[in-house]
Curated annotation (Swiss-Prot):
This is D-amino acid dehydrogenase 1. Its EC number is 1.4.99.-. SUPFAM superfamilies: FAD-linked reductases, C-terminal domain, FAD/NAD(P)-binding domain. Gene3D superfamilies: D-Amino Acid Oxidase, subunit A, domain 2, FAD/NAD(P)-binding domain. The gene is dadA1. GO terms for cellular component: cytoplasm; plasma membrane. Oxidative deamination of D-amino acids. GO terms for biological process: D-alanine catabolic process. Its cofactor is FAD. Belongs to the DadA oxidoreductase family. Pathway: Amino-acid degradation; D-alanine degradation; NH(3) and pyruvate from D-alanine: step 1/1. It holds the Pfam family DAO.
Length: 418
């Protein structure tokens, strides 16, 4: 089958790869000059199935108020006259219950675990490298209250068979030796030994090369203006390089997917939540992180990527605003400088932001739509890198009329149509 994948980020390129592996004729369209130049460009670098959790959870509304008042708080809301923002926020608040959290978590963890295993199989089959490390993730608690509050998370990890370790100060230092110089800054941690890290952009670029070797065509510098319908199917695309037609289409446009769906009189609850990162060259490897450290207080991820440190965090709800705010940079610099002083050449750091495509309940949207030849692979939020390979394999199976290896029925658009 001829399939056109809309979007050349990590979700679009992994989708193209697994569709090509399944024998389809695939073309990828993207407005940029190459793959992974938007949201996949400089994310935090984590592949963390154990942290696959909805943002909407019990207690979040009260925590959000506290975060908004913090100097280096992890949440920023810049109100705008945007009905889609407010509709999305209301839907998210409705999911902030214990019952909904459990349901949504149960849909996310199996996909994230499957995706990590699928990535491992891909790595073994192709030899692809991307500054990857398989040394786990350490969630670092600065206060005893944070450490004592891990009970609920641990129960969920137990339920899904996710390996974990509760660590005291010495245990944290054993996992991340550089923390030995700042042991007064934290009381303990929660380590997920099977989590991984890696450079998402590097991975996507190399996978795109593997796609080309499998016959996938990439049409860059191609802006999609409209997706044109004919009754209950997509007829063709209006683009900056003329009309494009295919037998089937995959919407993998991240935060921009919702706008294209609205123009077809269809709605999906995907809204952008901006995240920031800095990439810091390592100047002293002895005091740099080994893998990923999650600073629980500031919700910042500090990740070793080769000879660089990637520091990512912040949830900024401000629509499609891509302006870089220096206050967010200071938060990231504060976290990494506090826990790993002297590790990086901070003056040489690069500052970046991207728009995470979030659903109000947490799980992504994968599968069929009301239009017979249009499929979705979007809405992964902060977990696009974690879930990319698994999501792509699931969708490739669906489009090839195969039963996916995991139950993906609850990831379909139908959950919002009930």
């Amino acid at each position: 089958m001829q399939i056109m994948v809309l979007g050349g980020g990590v979700i679009g390129v992994t989708t193209a790869y697994y569709l090509a592996e399944a024998g389809h004729e695939v073309t990828v369209l993207d407005r940029q000059k190459g793959p992974a130049l938007e949201t996949s460009f400089a994310n935090a670098g984590e592949i963390s199935p154990g942290y696959a959790s909805p943002w909407a959870g019990p207690g979040i509304p009260l925590k959000a108020i506290k975060w908004l008042l913090m100097k280096h708080g992890p949440l920023v809301v810049r109100p705008a006259f945007d009905p889609h923002m407010w509709t999305w926020l209301v839907k998210m608040l409705r999911n902030c219950t214990t019952e909904r959290y459990a349901i949504n978590k149960s849909r996310m963890v199996p996909l994230a675990e499957y995706s990590r295993d699928t990535l491992k199989a891909l790595r073994e089959a192709t030899g692809i490298t991307y500054d990857e490390r398989t040394q786990g993730t350490l969630q670092l608690f600065r206060t005893q209250k944070q450490l004592d509050g891990t009970g609920g998370d641990v129960e969920v990890l137990k339920k899904y068979g996710v390996s974990y370790e509760i660590l005291d100060q010495d245990g944290c230092i054993a996992a991340e030796p550089a923390l030995g110089g700042v042991r007064e800054k934290f009381v303990g941690g929660l380590r997920l030994p099977h989590d991984e890290t890696g450079d998402c952009k590097m991975f996507t670029e190399k996978l795109a090369e593997l796609c080309v070797a499998r016959g996938v065509k990439f049409e860059y510098d191609t802006t999609i203006w409209r997706v044109l319908r004919s009754r209950n199917r997509v007829a063709n695309l209006s683009t900056s390089k003329g009309f494009k037609a295919s037998e089937a289409y995959v919407m993998a446009l991240g935060s921009y997917s919702a706008g294209f769906m609205r123009r077809m009189k269809r709605s999906i609850p995907v809204y952008p939540v901006k995240g920031y990162s800095i990439t810091v060259p390592i100047k002293d490897a002895d005091v740099a992180p080994v893998s990923t450290v999650m600073d629980e207080t500031y919700k910042v991820a500090i990740t070793r990527l080769g000879d660089r440190i990637r520091v990512g965090g912040t949830a900024e709800i401000s629509g499609f605003d891509l302006r870089l705010h220096e206050s967010r940079r200071r938060t990231l610099e504060h976290s990494v400088g506090d826990l790993f002083p002297g590790a990086g050449a901070m003056r040489e750091a690069t500052f970046w932001c991207g728009l995470r495509p979030m659903t109000p309940d947490g799980p992504p949207l994968i599968g069929r739509t009301e239009l017979s030849n249009l499929f979705l692979n979007t809405g992964h939020g902060t977990l696009g890198w974690t879930m990319a390979c698994g999501s792509a394999k699931v969708l490739a199976d669906i489009m090839s009329n195969k039963v996916p290896e995991i139950d993906a029925r609850a990831l379909a658009q139908e959950r919002y149509l009930k």
